[in-house]
């Protein structure tokens, strides 16, 4: 497993994500996967002003799309992001992506982030960007390893207290603990 030496996650065919094909819904337009570009001086990258969801597709059915989209918008609201699309527009775009790319079992990653219009902690003048990417991902855990039992680790890192971060948002910065626990 390329995530961690003791990981039991199934490796989907390992094509680097920047080399994949298909379409990404990017600020209201379908863009070729490899043609999507975000500037390296993006507020979302430097200050973790990005919120996201992770949604599974099982047998061409999207698992709880409306609930995930509602939570995505709730997270964006907590992060003071005025999303330029409605929940309905996002849901329609997601369904169209799944249908057009013929994903049977996969993963949907909608995300919202602040752009590169200004740098610094203050971000009032940044554009709010929105994208939806999907890809094939048949199973999260290797079925054979799953039968034997899945190993879990307890991170030495703890989630920040509720009064120190937007704990009830699915914000990128809150996931550094998950990343660190895999290293």
Features from the language model and the residues they span:
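Short, glycine/charge-rich beta-strand/loop segments that flank catalytic centers
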Residues: 86-95, 105-119
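Helix-start/capping segments and mature chain N-termini
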Residues: 3-85, 92-96, 121-183
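Non-catalytic accessory segments adjacent to catalytic cores
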Residues: 99-103
């Amino acid at each position: 497993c390329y995530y961690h030496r003791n990981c039991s996650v199934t490796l989907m065919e390992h094509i680097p994500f920047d080399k994949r094909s298909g379409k990404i819904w990017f600020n209201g337009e379908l863009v070729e996967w490899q043609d999507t570009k975000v500037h390296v001086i993006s507020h979302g990258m430097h200050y973790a002003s990005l919120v996201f969801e992770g949604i599974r597709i099982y047998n061409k059915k999207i698992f709880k799309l409306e609930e995930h989209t509602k939570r995505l918008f709730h997270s964006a609201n907590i992060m003071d992001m005025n999303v330029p699309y409605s929940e309905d527009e996002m849901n329609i775009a997601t369904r169209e992506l799944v249908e057009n790319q013929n994903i049977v079992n996969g993963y949907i990653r909608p995300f919202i982030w602040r752009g590169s219009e200004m740098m610094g902690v203050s971000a009032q003048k940044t554009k709010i960007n929105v994208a939806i990417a999907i890809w094939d991902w048949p199973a999260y855990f290797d079925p054979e390893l799953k039968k034997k039992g899945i190993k879990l680790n307890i991170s030495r890192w703890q989630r920040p207290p509720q009064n120190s971060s937007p704990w009830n948002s699915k914000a990128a910065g809150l996931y550094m603990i998950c990343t660190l626990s895999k290293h």
